[in-house]
Amino acid sequence: LTFVGSENHYPNQDAVDWFCHEVAPCLRVQGFKFVFQVIGTWKSRYVKSLQAVCPEMELVGYVEDLREYLNGSIVLVPIRIGSGMRMKILDAVSSMASFVTTTKGVEGIDLRHNEECLIADSATDFAAAVIRLEADKKLQVRLATQALKRLRELYNPQEMLERRLAVYDEILQNNTN
């Protein structure tokens, strides 16, 4: 299980804190054995306090090549606050890694539950999604493949250019009337 993000962005702190305090206990209750890799820059004092409640957490720190860590991993995006497109999801998709996220985590990217990813908003549902995904390698491959296909369809540069030009044409036509 892998999380990508640094401590200097508060939504990442909240996400890792929520996973360690709320989701990890749900995983343990189910007898699920895991390692929670956190990629990014974090202060050791904060990491130690989280490891006290989540000994499965391992700080990887900064890495040059995310694909090396993400490929074959289940990426966790337990984001509950913030806005904007989640680069960690784009990193997962480009690495062909399946991922579990929250509704907030996938906000801004038109990916669908059970089609391109698993979406869960409560700690128990998030843990269940992690366990489900870990147990089903075919599901991992299907979600990763579908996510890449969907993003290529949605964000095709040529189609985006054509949509932008259509908007410009409409604006120009409205201004001339």
Placement of each model-derived feature along the sequence:
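Conserved acidic donor-binding segment of nucleotide-sugar-dependent glycosyltransferases
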Residues: C117-T124, R132-K137
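Active-site donor-sugar recognition loop in glycosyltransferases
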Residues: I81-G84, I89, V106
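Conserved catalytic-core segment of nucleotide-activated headgroup transferases in glycan assembly
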Residues: L1-N71
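Glycosyltransferase donor-binding loop in the core domain
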Residues: N8-P11, G84, L118, R152
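Short acidic/histidine- and often glycine-rich active-site loop of Leloir-type glycosyltransferases
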Residues: T103-N114, L118-I119
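Short hydrophobic beta-strand element within catalytic cores of glycosyltransferases
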Residues: K88-A92, S98-T102
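Acidic donor-binding loop of glycosyltransferase active sites
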Residues: E56, L70-G84, S95-S98
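A charged, aromatic-enriched C-terminal amphipathic alpha-helix characteristic of glycosyltransferases
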Residues: K138-D169
